[in-house]
Amino acid sequence: MKLRNDCDQIVRRALAAVQPDAAVRRALEGNPFQGGRVVLVAVGKAAWSMARAACDCVGGRLDGGIVITKHGHAQGPIGSLLIREAGHPVPDQDTFSATEEALALTDGLTAEDTVLFLLSGGGSALFEAPLVPQEELQSITQSLLASGADIVEMNTIRKRLSAVKGGRFAQHCAPAKVFSIVLSDIIGDPLDMIASGPAYPDSSTCADARRIAEQYGLRLSPEASQCLERETPKVLDNVETLITGSVRELCAAASAACRELGYEPVLLTDSLDCEAREAGAFLAAVARAHQDTDCSLAFLAGGETVVHLTGSGLGGRNQELALSAAAGIAGLEDTAVFSLGSDGTDGPTDAAGGFVDGGTKERLARQGVRIFEVLKNNDAYHALAACGGLLHTGATGTNVNDVAVLLIRR
C-alpha cells in the first residue's frame, strides 16, 4: 500500500503544478487588446479551466464567446460564455454544431477586433468543420487511431479535411487579430500540430499527407483525395501566439513530488514516443537492473506512446504500458510502475491510467487472468480493474501529455 499511496500523492501534486490557470493569467496581464470587440474561443480538454482564468482577468472586455471541451469536462457556467461539450477522440455531431457556433461568433470581425483563442490538446476532435461528409471524417479518424498513427501523422491528414484546421480558423477570423494561448500536448511543442493548428501556419505539405494516407492504407473518397491536394496556409499575419505548459513541466513537477517523498528522481526522457508495450517492458528492465540499489529511486518518462489495436478489449495507452510492465517486474519487492494521462482520461475509459507492482501478475493469475492474452486483446482496463490497478482522477483541467514512473522503495 505504501507504493500506491506514493503514486497517488505524486499524481495529485504533479497535476496541481501543471494547471493552466496561472499561465493564462500571466499572458493576459495588462489586458493586451485593441479597442474593438474581444471574442473568446476556448477549445480542448483544458478549455474550461483556461476560459475561467481568462474571464477572471479580462471578463469585462469580452463581447461573448464559446468554450468547447470534451464530454464530462465542463464544470459549470462561466459568465455569459456558451459552454459546449463534444466528442473525443472521434468528432461527433456536437463537435460540428459547436464549431459552427464558434465560426458564427467570429464572422464579420474588423481589424480593430480580437479573437482570444485558448487552445489545448484534444482540439483536433473537438473543433471541426469538415470539408468531407461527417461520416467519412469519423471513419478516417477511427482508421488512423486503430492503425497506431502518431499524433503528427493524424493531424497532417485532418488539417486537409477541415475548414478550421491548419491555420484556416485564423484565416476565417481575419482581418481581426487572433491572440492565441496554447497549452501543449505534443512532444517538442510544434504549434502547427497542437490541436491541428487552427491558428498557426502549417509546416506539413500535401506530399506528407499523401505519404501518410498510403502508409496506413486509408480508403478515401475522390472528394477527400482532392482535399489532400489543397495546400494549407503557410503565412498568417494576424496571429500572435504564446505557448504555455508542456510535458517538460509535468515531468519536472512529478520529479519534485518524488523527491519530496524520499525518492531520488531520474528523468529518462520527456520525449517518449513508442509502443506502449515497449515502454512498459523498458521500465521493467530498468527496475530489474536497479534491484541492488540501497536508496529509493524514481525513474520518469514523459511523452505519449501509441497502441496498435489487435483486439476488441477496453483500455488506453497508459493502462497498456502499466500492464506490460507488470509482467517484467513480477516478484520484485517494493517496486511499482504507474502511467498517467494528464487530462484524466486514457483511451475511451473513465480511468486516467494504471498502477502495477511486483505482485500484480500473481494476483491476476489467481483470478485466471493472463497478461499476455489481455494485452493481445487490448483489454488492460478490465485486468487492472480486477486487481485494483486503475488510476482515477476525473477531468483534470489540463492536458500536457503523459508521464510514466517506476518507483523502487528502499
Segments (PLM) and residue ranges:
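N-terminal amphipathic/basic leader segments beginning at the initiator methionine
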Residues: 1-37, 41-42, 49, 193, ...
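Short beta-strand segments
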Residues: 41-43, 66-69, 116-121, 180-186, ...
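A glycine- and small-aliphatic-rich helix-loop capping segment at beta-alpha/alpha-beta transitions
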Residues: 53-62, 80-82, 103, 130-143, ...
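Glycine-rich oxoanion-binding loops at beta->alpha junctions
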Residues: 69-112, 153, 157-158
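Internal gly/pro-rich beta-alpha loop/helix module
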Residues: 133-222, 228
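Accessory alpha-helical/coil subdomains and C-terminal extensions
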Residues: 158, 176-179, 201-282, 286
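Active-site segments that bind and position negatively charged phosphate/pyrophosphate groups
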Residues: 262-339, 347-348
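Internal helix-turn-beta structural module
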Residues: 323-410
